[in-house]
UniProtKB/Swiss-Prot annotation:
One of its GO terms (molecular function) is pyridoxal phosphate binding. HAMAP family: SHMT (MF_00051). This is Serine hydroxymethyltransferase. Belongs to the SHMT family. Keywords: Amino-acid biosynthesis, Cytoplasm, One-carbon metabolism, Pyridoxal phosphate, Transferase. InterPro entries: PyrdxlP-dep_Trfase, PyrdxlP-dep_Trfase_major, PyrdxlP-dep_Trfase_small, Ser_HO-MeTrfase, Ser_HO-MeTrfase-like, Ser_HO-MeTrfase_PLP_BS, SHMT-like_dom. CDD domains: SHMT. It comes from Nitrosomonas europaea (strain ATCC 19718 / CIP 103999 / KCTC 2705 / NBRC 14298). Its cofactor is pyridoxal 5'-phosphate.
């Protein structure tokens, strides 16, 4: 029998020290990585329950194991809440990640060698949208579309030309570093014109979509996937939504083709996050996320930095560092020394290598969860600019670190 009084600190002090260090890092550093956020205490609690003990291969009411009465309730809650949140018909909450959700979509609808038309990774797409280093680019014939070099927005004319030239079986919309509104209906029309499936990966925009501040692709696309963290502010995981005629193929593609038992403790946390996302407080939060991103982009422009495509319509944007003669890797390192966390990111047609880059990506979901509003976002953008103006100046980095820590103290993530 286990003693419920035993703690991680008592059982595994080495691991506990690492966890404590990460807790402190999250509290003491300002998080600007666009794909990161802070899960609520309720989401964290759900992931730490005895649901982790339960195997439940299959789906509610159709399990391969006994004893699934309560996990069926848990999964059905997640299913119903996700369906209501995005006005979806079919949903699957079992994918362990966004990448696995995407893989399930491909396997459900495509055959090896079929043509896939997705956004170029170099222009803001994702590895799983046909990159040569990902299975999506190895199993399928991957063709990439990109951005208009003048506007740095999706080149819909090029997309249509490529679609007619290559006749893809599937067109993929969605991005990992694209700051503007994506026209799902334009994608739908192009897909229909060439007889292709339309698949939308809305992982980055899901929270904004749930709140009504970004167009909803559900009902427009044949398939929609998302992660459940990022702007949705849930646990790390994935989901699939689709038109009902794809239910059988998708269920099979998730289990048994790509996964075995679902992670019931994570599905419980997804259910909590979906409930939180249906609240007015969450809608207000998403509105503030966008306002904070726009404020930061404007201030950085005023400080002499170029924002890719000129502005942002969502939670993130790319900063071109070439005018500062600075690489993304150098900027990431300098900002981390000043207690501000970003990620290096390629800009469109970046001359630098992927692990060096000419830009950084900035996102505001995490700082908005802390409680930052426009004044704090303006102050923070100026701190970022101070570091980018003098990345090798230790005195500047120390001064910015002190100011960043003061903001963190004023706006804690979890408090005590």
């Amino acid at each position: 029998m286990f003693s419920q009084s035993l703690t991680i600190e008592q059982v595994d002090p080495d691991l506990w020290q690492a966890i404590k260090g990460e807790v402190q890092r999250q509290e003491d550093h300002i998080e600007l990585i666009a794909s990161e956020n802070y899960a609520s205490p309720a989401v964290l609690q759900a992931q730490g329950t005895v649901l982790t003990n339960k195997y439940a291969e299959g789906y509610p009411g159709k399990r391969y194991y006994g004893g699934c009465r309560y996990v069926d309730i848990v999964e059905q809650l997640a299913i119903d809440r996700l369906r209501n949140l995005f006005n979806a018909e079919y949903v699957n909450v079992q994918p362990h990640s966004g990448s696995q959700a995407n893989a399930a979509v491909y396997l459900s609808a495509l055959k090896p060698g079929d043509t896939l038309l997705g956004m170029s990774l170099a222009h803001g797409g994702h590895l799983t949208h046909g990159s040569a280093v990902n299975m999506s680019g190895k199993i399928f014939n991957s063709i990439s579309y990109g951005l208009n070099p003048e506007t740095e927005e999706i080149d819909y004319a090029e997309l249509e030309r490529l679609a007619h030239e290559h006749k893809p079986r599937m067109i993929v919309a969605g991005a990992s570093s694209y700051a503007r509104v994506i026209d799902w209906k334009a994608f739908r029309q192009i897909a229909d014109n060439v007889g292709a499936y339309l698949f939308v990966d809305m992982a980055h925009y899901a929270g904004l979509i749930a709140a009504g501040y970004y167009p909803n692709p559900v009902g427009i696309a044949d398939f929609v996937t998302s992660t459940t963290h990022k702007t949705l502010r849930g646990p790390r995981g994935g989901v699939i939504m689709a038109k009902p005629e794809h239910e059988k193929a998708l269920n099979s593609a998730v289990f048994p083709q790509t996964q075995g038992g679902p992670l019931m403790h994570v599905i419980a946390a997804k259910a909590v996050a979906f409930k939180e996302a249906s609240s007015q407080a969450f809608k207000d939060y998403q509105k503030q996320v966008i306002e904070n991103a726009r404020v930061m982009a404007r201030v950085l422009q005023q400080r002499g930095l170029r924002i890719v495509s000129g502005r942002t319509d969502c939670h993130m944007f790319l900063v071109d560092l070439r005018a500062k003669n600075l690489t993304g890797r150098e900027a990431e390192s300098a900002l981390e020394a000043a207690h501000i966390t970003v990620n290096k990111n390629a800009i469109p047609n970046d001359p630098q290598k992927p692990f060096v880059t000419s830009g950084i990506r900035i996102g505001t979901p995490a700082i908005t969860t802390r409680g930052f509003k426009e004044p704090e976002s303006e102050e923070l953008a100026n701190l970022v600019a101070d570091v980018l103006d003098a990345p090798a100046n230790t005195a500047v980095l120390d001064q910015v670190a002190r100011k960043a820590q003061a903001l963190c103290t004023k706006f804690p993530v979890y408090g005590n």
